Regions:
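Short, surface-exposed glycine/acidic/tryptophan-bearing loops
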Residues: 62-82
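Structural recognition of the beta-strand scaffold that forms the well-ordered cores
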Residues: 54-56, 81-85, 131
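Extended, low-complexity, intrinsically disordered C-terminal regulatory tails
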Residues: 43-68
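Catalytic cores and adjacent binding grooves of peptidoglycan-active enzymes
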Residues: 86-165
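Amphipathic alpha-helical interface surfaces
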Residues: 38-42, 64, 80, 93, ...
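Extracytoplasmic cell-surface/polysaccharide-interacting catalytic and binding patches
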Residues: 1-47, 148-165
C-alpha cells in the first residue's frame, strides 16, 4: 500500500525482529492514516529535497518495542516516528536530512541526531541515524542530540548550534 509517492506501508512497518520473533507489527486503520500523514507531511518533502531516504525503523507495536528494549510509550508505537538514514553513492551523510529539515522549514515534533561522533559538548557531523517525528497537532520542533556518557548510558541534550552544523 502506497502512503505517498515514494513511501509504502511495508517500508514504515517492516521489522526483521518482529518477523524473527513472530510478533504482529500490523498497524490499525487509525495507524495507517497517521503513517500516511507522516509520509505526506514530513517524509515526502524531505525525500523530494534530498533524494532517497532509508527508513531503518518506523512503526513498532508495543510488543516489538518491548522486545528491542525500547519504551512502549515511544512515538514509534504511536505511528509518529521513523529512524532514517541518507546514503548517496555508498556514503552515509545523515546530516543532510537535518539540513533539509531546517532549510525547508518543515513542521516536525522531534529531530534527534543519534550518536555517531556526538558528545556531551559536540554536535555530531556524522550521526548514525536521524530519529524524526511528526504529530497531527502540537509539534514542538525539538532538536536533540543523543550520545553515550562515560558510563555508556544514553543521554539527550538540545542541539547547541541549531542552524550551523
Amino acid at each position: 500500500m502506497r502512503l505517498s509517492k515514494n513511501f509504502t506501508l511495508k517500508e514504515l512497518t517492516r521489522s526483521n525482529t518482529a518477523t524473527r520473533l513472530g510478533i504482529d507489527n500490523e498497524p490499525s486503520k487509525e495507524g495507517i492514516l497517521k503513517l500516511t500523514l507522516l509520509a505526506t507531511e514530513l517524509l515526502q518533502p524531505l525525500r523530494n529535497a534530498v533524494g532517497s531516504l532509508r527508513i531503518t525503523s518506523g512503526y513498532r507495536s508495543p510488543q516489538l518495542s518491548e522486545a528491542i528494549g525500547s519504551s512502549s510509550n515511544s512515538q514509534h508505537c504511536r505511528y509518529e516516528a521513523v529512524d532514517m538514514q541518507f546514503v548517496k553513492r555508498g556514503k552515509m551523510d545523515n546530516i543532510k536530512i537535518y539540513d533539509a529539515l531546517i532549510d525547508l522549514d518543515l513542521d516536525f515534533d522531534q529531530c534527534i541526531l543519534e550518536f555517531g561522533n556526538a558528545t556531551e559538548h559536540i554536535d555530531p557531523t556524522e550521526p548514525d541515524w536521524i530519529h524524526l517525528s511528526w504529530k497531527v497537532v502540537d509539534n514542538r520542533r525539538q532538536t536533540l542530540v543523543a550520545y553515550k556518557d562515560e558510563n555508556n548510558k544514553t543521554k539527550y541534550r538540545p542541539i547547541i548550534n541549531y542552524n550551523c552544523i
